[in-house]
Swiss-Prot record:
It catalyses: L-glutamate + acetyl-CoA = N-acetyl-L-glutamate + CoA + H(+). It holds the Pfam family NAT. This is Amino-acid acetyltransferase, mitochondrial. GO terms for molecular function: L-glutamate N-acetyltransferase activity. Pathway: Amino-acid biosynthesis; L-arginine biosynthesis; N(2)-acetyl-L-ornithine from L-glutamate: step 1/4. Its EC number is 2.3.1.1. One of its GO terms (biological process) is ornithine biosynthetic process. N-acetylglutamate synthase involved in arginine biosynthesis. Its main location: mitochondrion. The gene is ARG2. GO terms for cellular component: mitochondrial matrix. The lineage of its organism: Eukaryota, Fungi, Dikarya, Ascomycota, Saccharomycotina. Keywords: Acyltransferase, Amino-acid biosynthesis, Mitochondrion, Transferase, Transit peptide. It is an enzyme of class 2 (transferase). Belongs to the acetyltransferase family.
Length: 608
């Protein structure tokens, strides 16, 4: 039976608090302070156990400051006081623009920031009750971890049926939607009475310009008390004086835009999370979901991939809508913000290390690295996609060999910034002239990510120097003959098919692509995905067939390299460990690869 008296349009009715009670007179209730302390210890332990590095644990604690019980409520009460009228004059002006109400005076202060995660749940009707209960536990855990969740319920089939004008009254569909809102709210309440949820209808109104917040306090009040707002996708139309169903994606877009206008020291939207029965964005290559999507670089390619016909059209449209909605929302947020798309079953996983939502809050990374080669058996298939607005990526490639000075003069790269990136990453000074003498004219590829946050320089190295030189001489003669024929008006033959297929280019029998420099700014190392973006560009786009590299045996990054390599070999009598990966690696040349890795002289000198 629908409990319509609990919530009405334009109001937010508080729901009863659950209190701890004992089942028998012989047992004693756990004191709130002790319970809060135990929860805090458990949370800190989960952070330290789940974060892969000390840096990730430190970043999480500094950002989210996990608090429980009374501590959590006090912190968020202070934050909402700032939201409703505290702080600098400029802050007050921006808050007034957001809420439509002037602040009412200095009520308190807090040094923290409200860290918001907007969660959209689609097709709730298809989700089993036990999964909804477990999802409620995940949402409650997010709150205890210092995140402030806002749940947006998708109207789904109810909205589609209403738009088809099947003659049923609006109230019929309103009830169906509110049933979904209550179902999610009850799951959160059951999971954690201390956190609790607040179902909200009447938060939005709309006119010809779009959505607006009709009563901002309905959202801010539960947030201030550590409660989880669960929003119905309903809005009052100021033009027609009717309440209407709205798209959940439009609600996510609007909320993100408006909350992004709040000063960052008061409120920050950190995560956009879509829980969808179809899961993450599907990948042809992975036979599962894309692990990570750098939207600035990959959006158009992935949209085109979804039209390849490997999934039914109805599913394709849902994935495209999710991709578009994520892109629109993340554009309003800082680069550190991220989006997640996963299934209800995965969102319900209780394990911290396996639940991608919880894991991403703790580490700011996907459960597995996106740069793990797809063809390796140790790379699992996932149903979750992590998305960021991301960073632009510059890629240069040449079969004959690039020259760093020439590319700098052309404006394709900034060599000074590239030097700085390499030295900052390695903590050593680079002998520039020595390096240029070695690599110029033999650079196979250059990848630069973001604002020179990460880069890779790949060179062509001779497997058999004599035969390699013969090949280069033959290529020069062929080029000269082709130029002479063209000048004489003789038509040139069509290029071989492999030249049109890109990654199907056969391996040069006398050369190998060698990762000479792989650098990431120290401030971008760890969870920013820069290393993954660069490495993925090398092994999945530029050089998918074969890539060779070396690393000092004591390099702490070697574990990361081991996970991404097809094989490795510690070279006896040297300080080097050799790695190789790719679809068509030539293990028969390993002895010659060892020669390459041992004969290259380092260009990095003394420590900075």
């Amino acid at each position: 039976m629908l409990r319509s008296s609990r919530i009405t349009a334009g109001t937010c009715v508080s729901r009863g608090w659950h209190s701890y009670t004992t089942k028998t007179p012989t047992k004693t209730a756990i004191p709130p302070a002790a319970k809060s302390s135990n929860e805090a210890k458990d949370l800190i332990l989960s952070v330290l156990q789940s974060a892969a590095t000390k840096r990730e644990a430190k970043t999480y604690i500094s950002r989210y400051a996990p608090l429980t019980g009374v501590e959590l409520q006090k912190k968020k009460e202070g934050l909402v006081q700032r939201l409703l009228g505290v702080g600098k004059e400029q802050d007050n002006k921006e808050i007034e623009n957001l809420t439509g109400h002037a602040p009412e005076g200095l009520l308190g202060d807090s040094e923290g920031t409200l860290r918001v995660a907007i969660i959209k749940i689609r097709d709730i009707k298809s989700i089993e009750d036990d999964l909804i209960a477990q999802m409620g536990e995940t949402i409650a855990r997010l709150s205890r971890l210092g995140v402030s969740p806002i749940v947006v319920v998708d109207a789904g089939k109810a909205r589609n049926d209403f738009l088809k004008l099947d003659n049923k009254p609006f109230r019929h569909y309103q009830k169906l939607i509110l049933q979904k809102v209550f179902k999610i709210s009850d799951a959160i309440d059951a999971a954690s009475p201390d956190v609790g949820a607040r179902p909200i209808e009447g938060l939005f109104s709309m006119n010809k310009k779009g959505l607006r917040l009709a009563m901002p306090q309905m959202l801010m009040h539960p947030l201030s008390h550590g409660k989880v707002p669960v929003l119905a996708p309903l809005a009052y139309d100021d033009v027609t004086s009717e309440e209407k169903l709205v798209m959940a994606d439009d609600v996510v877009h609007f909320l993100t835009q408006k909350l992004a206008e709040v000063p960052a020291n008061i409120l920050s939207v950190e995560k956009i999370i879509f829980v969808d029965p179809l899961g993450g964005i599907p990948s042809v290559e992975r036979s599962g979901a894309h692990v990570f999507v750098n939207l600035k670089q990959e959006l158009s390619d992935i949209a085109a991939e979804l039209h390849m016909g490997f999934i039914p059209p109805a599913q394709r449209e849902v994935h495209l809508a999710n991709l578009k909605a994520m892109h629109k929302a993340l554009k309003f947020l800082p680069p550190t913000a991220s989006g997640l798309i996963t299934t209800p079953a995965v969102a319900a996983i209780p394990s911290v290390g396996r639940n991608p939502i919880i894991y991403n809050v703790l580490t700011d990374r996907p459960v597995i690295s996106p740069s793990l080669p797809v063809e390796l058996k140790k790379t699992p298939t996932l149903e979750t996609t992590l998305l960021r607005e991301g960073m632009p990526v510059i890629t240069l490639k040449s079969d004959k060999g690039l020259n760093l000075i020439t590319e700098h003069e052309k404006g394709n790269i900034d060599l000074d910034r590239l030097w700085h990136l390499i030295e900052d990453s390695f903590g050593r000074r680079i002998d520039k002239q020595h390096y240029l003498n070695r690599v110029n004219g033999k650079i196979a590829g250059i990848i630069i990510a973001g604002d020179y946050e990460g880069a890779a320089i790949i060179t062509w190295e001779d497997i058999d120097p004599v035969k390699a030189q013969e090949d280069r001489d033959a290529a020069d003669r062929a080029a000269a003959e082709a130029a002479a024929a063209y000048a004489a008006g003789i038509p040139l033959p069509s290029p071989p098919l492999y030249q049109k297929l890109g990654d199907a280019v056969p391996l040069n029998p006398n050369q190998v692509a060698y990762l000479d420099k792989f650098a990431v700014l120290k401030r971008s190392q760890g969870s920013s995905s820069v290393a993954d973006v660069v490495f993925k560009g090398m092994v999945m786009s530029q050089f998918p067939n074969e890539l060779l590299w070396r690393s000092r045996k004591n390099n702490p990054v070697n574990k990361w390299y081991f996970d991404r390599s097809k094989g490795s070999f510690k070279i006896p009598g040297s300080e080097w460990c050799m790695f190789w990966t790719g679809r068509k690696t030539r293990e028969q040349y390993l002895e010659r690869f060892v020669d390459i890795c041992t004969r290259i002289e380092p260009s990095l000198r003394e420590e900075l």
